[in-house]
Amino acid sequence: GKLLNSNNYLVYCGGGEGVMEAIAKGVSHDGGTCVGILKGISTDEMNQYIDIPIATNMGITRNALLAYSCDASVAISGNYGTLSEIAYALQLNKTVIGIETWDIDGVQNMDSEAKVIQKLNRMFK
């Protein structure tokens, strides 16, 4: 999150706990902006570091909104929710970069956050 923020990226995530909260916390560290695409109808489920909450009431199908909203996707570890985010992004021909995540065709796995930022910067700057 800190690296994304220090490189001036607007960050979208699911807005919940775990990796989503860690990313949002890092983004907010120096005043960055993190958008949370939430599963429920209220903001009660979001973590405290989300700047712009979007309550969808869509459950896990909100992962499609995440994929549509982003220019690229970074998947960090994760379970089936992360897998569905990866699948949506790949179906939309978005770049998917992974760190210790699903090993499937189309995911560009990196072994460090610094390499992820280098890849994003080559793509967008």
Regions found by a protein language model. Name each.
Residues 103:
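Short, flexible loop segments at boundaries between secondary-structure elements
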Residues 74, 93-95:
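Structural loop-to-beta junction motif characteristic of Rossmann-like glycosyltransferase folds
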Residues 53-57, 97, 107-122:
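Short acidic-hydrophobic, aromatic-tinged amphipathic segments that line or gate anion-handling sites
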Residues 17-88, 100:
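Acidic/glycine-enriched connector segments
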Residues 3-9:
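A short, Lys/Arg-enriched amphipathic alpha-helix followed by its capping loop at the start of a domain
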Residues 10-17:
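A short beta-strand-loop structural module common to alpha/beta enzyme folds
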